[in-house]
Amino acid sequence: MVEALNAVYPYDLALLPEDYEKTTAPDAVQAANAARPFLNPVYPYQQPVAGDFGFPIVMPPFFNSYDFTSIHGNTLSLRLNKPLKRTAKGLQLLLGSGLSVNADGQLESSEGISEADAPLQINDGVLQLSFGEGLSVNDHGELESKGKVEAVTLPLALQDHVMSLSFGQGLQVNDQGQLEALAMVHSTSAPLKVTNNNLELALGRGLIVDDQGQLRLAPNLLWPESPLAIEQGTNHLILFYNQSLDVEDGKLTLPEPFDPLTLDGGRLRMQLAPNSGLAVTEKGSLGINWGEGIQVKEQKITLKVTPANGLAVTEQGGLNINWGNGIKVDEQKVTLKTSNEFALTENGLYLTSPLNPIEVNQHGQLGIALGYGFHAHRGYLELTPQTLWTGLPIGNNGTFHTKQDCKIFLSLTRLGPMVHGTFMLQAPQYELTTNGMREITFSFNSTGGLEQPAPVTYWGALDPPPTAKAAEIENQKRVKKRAAPDPPVEPPPKRRGDLAVLFAKVAEQAMELAKEQAVQAQPPEHVNTDWADHMNLLRFMPNTLVYPTAATIAANLQFHDTRLSLRRATLKIRLNGSPDSAYQLGFMLELVGTQSASIVTDTISFWYYAEDY
């Protein structure tokens, strides 16, 4: 019998059979092994010592999970992957087609190799390696490099043309020249610790390691109190709980509560409906948001009642209304007492049969049904103006070349489907030649409003004849204005000599000019610029179907004869025809058979179809 190291606890020497195959190591290796101390391959790597109860402490085996595995909880076994498997005869190799084991137990190929991928090739049934320049096979059949290695990459290193492997802590090269990991643990994390190069498990109160090396609860654990208990048979610590608690993923939680409660971040919270009148105070109490008319009196919710507002509380605690004339209760509902001329509906009180022209508008307001040509303004029923004009051109109101250098008169009056127009131009300081003149254009927007810059200073509606009441009010304003005395004008200071007289005349002329300009800056009384709010200005615009926009055709032009200083001329009127504005009226003079004439026209009338016709 031969003695050998037993790798199973208690790690004594096992007796092996005589025919156990044993490899004899070289003398140097045997001497090195003999000098080494006895190695226990199981944690804690030393002879077991007696514990508190006098028995040896059995620690669990320390093994690498990549090479070993645990079977049935306490048996250490090798971790196997294919092509290895366990059988009743021991560890065997799984063989596929083309492989077999001969009588000497050696693995060999039972089929010839027919094909091979480069750099391998088959010659006469022999597998050979193809290699190029720089490689050769030495006398020992080994592949070697003919040249010298000039450079390598990490973790390889090159020194004196010798290639070596660089490695750090935790790795070493053994006597056989193989790279292996050092069996030393340098650092751990709790509950593991290293003592004298041994890995240990730090145990607290209530934990022990049993004879099988397994971690268990200590038998002297204090008996738990309710709601904790020890389950019989399993010795598991359990917790008793009722239906108000639940266990989810091994954690004690609250189950989903019934409305109006909900869980918010693991905390129980009450859901309050919006506009419910309920709120949670700063102290966490449920309260009521008090509105106006509500109060708490003697810890009771009650109404705030003001008797002066017609409300009262009866002796029975009910809310009552002090009734006045015109109010009654009908079928337990407060309603109005109405006469035969009025009726109550779901929409309110209305006249049963208003006589024309009385009506109730869409806003429920009583008024007069207004037809074409009438409107309500300033509290009176008035005629809607039928004329837009520049006003009487008493002073210069137009622009020929410069501002207010001429008089322009334009009047547009609506009559049925037609608009009657009147035009006059007076610019006596200018002469018209055979070349004609530039066009005077009135441009209007999509609602009929005059666009700026305009050729005239003022543009508005002609006030219709006022009513008797309105005329009386305007007359009182004029009388009051006349009664107010003009402010005194202080005379200019007296100066000596002709120069002082000249300065006085210049100052007097400047004051008269300023007064004239101030008068011209105000619109004439017969031009009302506020009528646009009461008029449909499109009624005065040229019809875009008859006179198209952006189309200079014959239908857009009218030609009228006139006189310029007793000389014959033609006034060309253009209706629309420009893409720059929604509506346009253009006026241009042309001489007939003469060289020049002063620009002073007659009053010229023209007609066209209105836009809303």
Swiss-Prot record:
It holds the Pfam family Adeno_shaft. The keyword 4Fe-4S does not apply. It is found in: Virion; Host nucleus. GO terms for biological process: adhesion receptor-mediated virion attachment to host cell; cell adhesion; symbiont entry into host cell. The keyword Electron transport does not apply. Keywords: Capsid protein, Host nucleus, Host-virus interaction, Late protein, Viral attachment to host adhesion receptor, Viral attachment to host cell, Virion, Virus entry into host cell. InterPro entries: Adeno_fibre (IPR000931), Adeno_fibre_knob (IPR000978), Adenobir_fibre_prot_rpt/shaft (IPR000939), Adenovirus_pIV-like_att (IPR008982), Attachment_protein_shaft_sf (IPR009013). GO terms for cellular component: host cell nucleus; viral capsid. Residues 474-496 are annotated as: Disordered. Induction: Expressed in the late phase of the viral replicative cycle. All late proteins expressed from the major late promoter are produced by alternative splicing and alternative polyadenylation of the same gene giving rise to non-overlapping ORFs. A leader sequence is present in the N-terminus of all these mRNAs and is recognized by the viral shutoff protein to provide expression although conventional translation via ribosome scanning from the cap has been shut off in the host cell. Belongs to the adenoviridae fiber family. Forms spikes that protrude from each vertex of the icosahedral capsid. Interacts with host receptor to provide virion initial attachment to target cell. Fiber proteins are shed during virus entry, when virus is still at the cell surface. The tail region anchors the fiber to penton base capsomers, whereas the shaft, built from several repeated motifs, allows the knob to protrude from the virion. Homotrimer. Interacts (via N-terminal tail region) with pentons. This is Fiber protein. It comes from Murine adenovirus A serotype 1 (MAdV-1). The lineage of its organism: Viruses, Varidnaviria, Bamfordvirae, Preplasmiviricota, Tectiliviricetes.
